[in-house]
Amino acid sequence: MIREPFRYRETFAAILADTPAHADAAKRGMIAARQVLECYIARDPFFASTFFPYEPETDETLICHMANAAAHAGVGPMATVAGAIAAAGINAMMDAGATFGVIDNGGDIALVSDRDVRVGVHAGSAPVSDRIAFIVPPQEQHSYGICTSSATVGPSISFGMADAVTIFARDPLDADAWATAVCNRIRPDDHRVLETIDPSRVDGVYAIMGESVVSWGKVPPVVPARVDEQLIAAGDRL
């Protein structure tokens, strides 16, 4: 297995692949997706700035997919951008014949895998941060999403207070959108946002808020781990 950093404009990702050819396919897929997105935003800047669901005036598949996933979660379409770019890379890897690939796009992960994958959890100053991992079972049929949103870690805009909200979903864009939505609204004493989740779109939720941990739906096994924060894909490390 190889691990390659990838940087293109605002995308800072890490690619895990079995072969250099599969990693190269991932890079091409992510670049192509970014180019489609940038071309559309040039025509419709509001798509990039709104925090609310938005119906784009286009039939471009990527743009419509982003808007649809965001609308179901009640957030703006750019809440799905990291998941969308990562998913594009994984889909390109699969088209190139890959049965294993992981793309970490700043804490938002898309993967396809014929084996178990261990995904560590970084949650800022929370007690469990860097001490646990999920054992994600094989996901061989399509790209799978494991996306994390945080109000205390990283540069992304958040209206919440959670140290980490991780969403597991069969579509990385759904995972990304719902990570934002849940992180914005969940509180240690208020979990009502979980009642709004469509279980046909989201498999599970794992939310960390200081010493409080909330789990919903089908979450992969959680095991003790020693997580190296430096392995998280971020702009200051690539």
UniProtKB/Swiss-Prot annotation:
Domain of life: Archaea
SUPFAM superfamilies, per the entry: ApbE-like (SSF143631)
Gene3D superfamilies noted in UniProt: ApbE-like domains
Family designation: Belongs to the UPF0280 family.
Protein name: UPF0280 protein Mboo_1274
Species this chain originates from: Methanoregula boonei (strain DSM 21154 / JCM 14090 / 6A8)
